[in-house]
């Protein structure tokens, strides 16, 4: 039986509000020394023994009896088969979501550019896709096909040559929706491996698993810890914390809607965070009543209750202006502006992973099919981070072409600066290309 909900109530007018808010927002991962050491041992084993280590760890952690890596490779035909094993409605939903995600991300694609100066010097930027990206997908029955779309499609739009997906199949459990999503998203290769060992295989390569340039995708604490350790060998997307939603409401939205929006993140796990901010105290009471009324109807009521009681809050503010200030202080992963005129407040929002505008725009639409990416910065990192996008799978190279005149002119400036830093070879390298004015063009 679910315990009664006792969501925290805060008031921004209280003198110790800032301290209470900081305590509410604090979260530390549970990657302790033992987890860290186990991950390091796994990475070392994969680097040294390659496929053999992957087979051993898969047998140990996923409960599978496999003879070799050949048993852990899914051919393209298996992905296509998955499309026939899901319902027509599921396939249509995946295809519609994929089309919207693709359309949105195509607008993010950056192109190379150059400009030419008067003396013929050309400066610019060359935009190049990564050669190969690795996508980690959690396995088992609780896996998420939407994450496959959100991670793989931006990579393909960017022009990544090969997208390699790893997905564990604990006790042989294969999620057909995940494989169907991989087929629709254009994933090139799939290995049924998971955990820190899969991250290590992507980062360093084995006899069967190709080395990638970047590893993206969510996972448990072992996956997150492994991503930390391989960063530098490869790029990573981010180290994601628990899911978050912050709803700013003027008090005019149906309180049942708001309660369910809070549940939509709280149901992810016990550490997820759901916060409502409003200047209307009576409305906060109504939402609290809706939470109590609706919670018993939820399939994941225990998880929601633990999340709401442990990390949730209803925050009373002076007015909408202060609500926006609190939102910027929190820098949430998901921010709902459930107000009459969200466009009026949008310019003041500085820190948020995704902003959901208006009463009808539930966060769930963004999770699945609106188009923008649902891989978003958490734990306040929206202050300096962005959603996953096409730009995460592109890199930029500077282009510099100097004409004779340009090299001569720039050489004088470079010489002065280089000698000021006592780097004589730098200076002389530039000076060799300086020509007298009367010599230019001869």
From Swiss-Prot:
Top EC class of this enzyme: oxidoreductase
- Entry's EC annotation: 1.1.1.23
Q: Which GO terms describe its cellular component?
A: cytosol
Where substrate binds, per the record, is at: 243, 265, 268, 334, 367, 421, 426
GO MF terms on file? Answer: histidinol dehydrogenase activity; NAD binding; zinc ion binding
At the top level of its lineage, which domain of life is listed? Answer: Bacteria
| PROSITE patterns given in the database record | HISOL_DEHYDROGENASE
Q: Does the keyword Oxidoreductase apply?
A: yes
* Amino-acid positions noted as binding Zn(2+) in the UniProt annotation, renumbered to this chain: 265, 268, 367, 426
Q: How is the cofactor bound?
A: Binds 1 zinc ion per subunit.
Q: Which UniProt keywords apply?
A: Amino-acid biosynthesis, Histidine biosynthesis, Metal-binding, NAD, Oxidoreductase, Zinc
What are the required cofactors? Zn(2+)
Q: In which pathway does it act?
A: Amino-acid biosynthesis; L-histidine biosynthesis; L-histidine from 5-phospho-alpha-D-ribose 1-diphosphate: step 9/9
Q: Which CDD domains match?
A: Histidinol_dh (cd06572)
Return one Gene Ontology term, BP aspect: L-histidine biosynthetic process
Give the annotated active site.
Answer: 333-334
Which reaction equations make up its catalytic activity? L-histidinol + 2 NAD(+) + H2O = L-histidine + 2 NADH + 3 H(+)
Name the protein family: Belongs to the histidinol dehydrogenase family.
Function summary: Catalyzes the sequential NAD-dependent oxidations of L-histidinol to L-histidinaldehyde and then to L-histidine.
What's the protein here called? Histidinol dehydrogenase
Q: Which organism is it from?
A: Pseudomonas fluorescens (strain ATCC BAA-477 / NRRL B-23932 / Pf-5)
Per the record, the gene is: hisD
